[in-house]
């Protein structure tokens, strides 16, 4: 991934860590974070299902307009922390 792409993901991760951003987190931004962490996406109607080899957790997201649901933002944040998916980056 290009450096500019990594910088964008770092900024999105900073927003994801903030509880203030849960209600106004763009669905496409949450999707970009998961894809940058090597999750595979499968779409079935309005459900975007993300899986990753080596991780048993399945992430199921449904957009509400252009936003992600707040509880799903929290789930993604906790999944990333629990599995230490950010490598050398600050994961809170």
Model-identified regions with their sequence ranges:
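Intrinsically disordered, low-complexity and often Lys/Arg-enriched segments
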Residues: 1-9, 85-92
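N-terminal amphipathic/basic helix or basic patch
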Residues: 7, 11, 25-28
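Short, contiguous pre-domain boundary segments
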Residues: 12-17
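Polyanion-binding surface elements
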Residues: 18-37
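A short, structured beta-strand/loop element
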Residues: 33-59, 64
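Basic, low-complexity intrinsically disordered segments
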Residues: 44, 55-58, 83-88, 92
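C-terminal structural segments of small proteins and small subunits
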Residues: 64-91
